[in-house]
């Protein structure tokens, strides 16, 4: 330590002067809690500054330190602090022996679904009222794609317009989430929506954001498409430094981890309409292996373009009547929908220790793939039977003990019978006549939320 730098305040003052002199900041622009990147420091600048600090402090300073401690205050505190004891660098890790079967507690939930649904209680009331949120696509959604030509107008007129849509998807409080208006404008609204609903889920769990900083909290977010990224990049003159992160699928999870300063896994999951359930599965596994001590699992889906509607129309998948009739002889296809759902998960023993409200318990889950079936998009009955058996085995639950299943239930003439047969093969055998298996499908109320479909059923 040099004589001129004896405290954090001294180093903060030196860093401010350095930024003003070498990076071009004005003193008024330098916020001690703003990231160095936001203050204009590039990777090349970081290399130069690390050399200056190494000479100044008489110890090695790496450019990586600026990313691990990204603000002036954080960097100064790190560089002035005594060297840590190597044995205390990492917290003691939980033994995983015997933990792989530990139940997982659901301690918080949040959701935003069509029909004015802004939380789990509102969803339950919506279902009890036997309501449906399905309607016509808002006119402004497809205006961008109508170039005025007769050909395009004819194509749009022949495209299914039924869906389940959220209102005000362009509304976002960027200041609350510490995002500039310019960056927010380039963000996929799915990123914005997930930030909002995740915050609500943490509030529902009674967890403050400050308590999560630098914690081993994982984020697992299901999403399928970033139509916004494709739309926003069609005009090259409007592409800027925020465009890549604004439209990247990986950032849907990473954005939340960044905002809350979470240090656990941060994974975007795309397995089509199972995305959010696979996200929950991965979150549970992460908790059981102690990669995370708390996990946020989510799914989000918005419908911004007529292109996917048209693609589904070409194979006759969408309902021309605008009804998602699950397990109904009159089923004529599914209805696409929007929404977001988030659950906060914790090991049951930890939740009980901490006095958390336990809303539900996940005892087991399983994931597989159809493999070679009757076409790339065709379900495989044998694979469905196998994944059900594995899930109940992992949960140590006899199938005959199950009295209700929230199904996929898309309302398609092929998918629903295959799912019903698989359920019957696994859950129907050996069942007493006075112990029927009840099934349901939230898609009849909300439509098929695709990447958020599984978590909508889970929250129900």
Task: Give residue spans per PLM region.
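Phosphopantetheine-dependent thiolation modules in NRPS/PKS and related acyl-activating systems
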Residues: 2-94
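Internal signal-anchor transmembrane helix that establishes type II topology
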Residues: 96-100
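Interdomain regulatory linker/hinge segments that flank or connect interaction modules
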Residues: 1-2, 333
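Condensing-enzyme catalytic core of the thiolase-fold
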Residues: 101-460
